[in-house]
């Protein structure tokens, strides 16, 4: 599903609505992870699917009349993992998964490590979190904050312009 289009994911956590609306295109596929649909209802957006254990979805009957609702009740995976396991896309733009609680932030790091075949960008307030490709180059304005956190064995050959060098990391 969606294997040719980028997909927007909405979780139950805090969503910077202004940031989301700047990026979201009305014809883009959108999937709510469980109660993420509650955010979309306030914006009058109907997701293509709602996937999760549905423990935080408000008014399930309303949604069942509007879109496909997939209930996966197992507690061995998070709602985000349930969504990723049931969708395929070139890129995912994910809102509402990080920031509210530290364990949720750790969980997205786990997801980035576990789902290496998925290209996911998490939007968390002023931060974006994503797994770097094998080769990456970026030019940023001076004083831009950037953090590099290895999730697997990695090697940075060279860095340039950083306050603290990470060469040969």
Where are these regions (language model features)?
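Solvent-exposed alpha-helices and their adjacent loops that cap or buttress functional pockets
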Residues: 1-3, 22-25, 63, 87, ...
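N-terminal nucleotide-binding beta1-loop-alpha1 segment
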Residues: 1-14
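Short active-site oxyanion
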Residues: 5-7, 25-30, 46-48
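Metabolite-binding pocket within alpha/beta catalytic cores that recognizes anionic/polar moieties
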Residues: 13-21, 25, 31-33, 37-39
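A short secondary-structure junction signal
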Residues: 19-21, 104-108, 132-135, 159-161
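Acidic/Gly/His-enriched mid-domain segments of enzyme catalytic cores or analogous surface patches
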Residues: 23, 35-119, 123
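Short, flexible loop segments at boundaries between secondary-structure elements
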Residues: 122-134
């Amino acid at each position: 599903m969606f294997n040719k289009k980028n997909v927007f994911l909405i979780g139950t956590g805090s969503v910077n609505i202004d940031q989301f609306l700047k990026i979201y295109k009305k014809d883009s596929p959108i999937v709510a992870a469980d109660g993420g649909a509650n955010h979309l209802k306030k914006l009058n957006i109907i997701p293509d699917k709602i996937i999760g254990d549905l423990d935080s979805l408000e008014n399930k009957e309303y949604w069942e009349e509007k879109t496909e609702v997939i209930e996966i009740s197992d507690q061995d995976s998070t709602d985000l993992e349930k969504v990723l396991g049931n969708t395929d896309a070139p890129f995912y733009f994910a809102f509402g998964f990080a920031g509210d609680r530290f364990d949720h932030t750790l969980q997205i790091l786990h997801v980035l490590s576990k789902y290496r075949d998925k290209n996911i960008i998490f939007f968390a307030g002023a931060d974006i979190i994503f797994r770097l490709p094998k080769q990456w180059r970026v030019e940023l304005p001076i004083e831009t904050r950037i953090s590099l956190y290895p999730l697997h064995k990695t090697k940075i050959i060279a860095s340039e312009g950083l306050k603290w060098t990470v060469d040969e990391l």
